[in-house]
């Protein structure tokens, strides 16, 4: 995978900011950022297009959206995070890392103005069917969903009528959906 020259420097800056915020706001339990970065990047090996608009639902502490935005730096990222301390953190990170390709929406996605995404990502937010439901209006049949799942990914999609694939790496299941009907 071709990474931008400044990728690991930006990741180091992110890690410093995360540790500072985490002392006060308890955003995440992760102590070592490298496995999180690798987990965030892994599905890009299987993504066969360069999305113009990417939506990340329940962005939390920025996994995977911040790292994906560093790599897919010509894509426009919309991060939806309703918890104030997390959305504030994401906005601060965006400014500190000079990420001009991200917009943080401090709201639940279902409360926001609809935009069509080429790619919708989410990591450990909710069950697949619920996530699809709350994203209604943000996708069409050409949108790809990339969902970072653990166990049970296969059961979650058993009733879906769309193209799907699951790529496993360790305990992580990367779920790709395409052709989800609105």
Curated annotation (Swiss-Prot):
Known function: Specifically methylates the N7 position of guanine in position 527 of 16S rRNA.
Catalysed transformations (reactions): guanosine(527) in 16S rRNA + S-adenosyl-L-methionine = N(7)-methylguanosine(527) in 16S rRNA + S-adenosyl-L-homocysteine
Subcellular location, principal: cytoplasm
Family to which the UniProt record says this protein belongs: Belongs to the methyltransferase superfamily. RNA methyltransferase RsmG family.
Descriptive protein name: Ribosomal RNA small subunit methyltransferase G
GO cellular component: cytosol
NCBIfam families: rsmG_gidB
Binding site for S-adenosyl-L-methionine: 58, 63, 109-110, 123
Enzyme Commission identifier(s): 2.1.1.170
Species assigned in the record: Campylobacter fetus subsp. fetus (strain 82-40)
Enzyme class, spelled out: transferase
Origin superkingdom: Bacteria
Keywords noted in UniProt: Cytoplasm, Methyltransferase, rRNA processing, S-adenosyl-L-methionine, Transferase
InterPro entries in UniProt: rRNA_ssu_MeTfrase_G, SAM-dependent_MTases_sf
UniProt subcellular location: Cytoplasm
Pfam short name (any one): GidB
An annotated Gene Ontology molecular function: rRNA (guanine-N7-)-methyltransferase activity
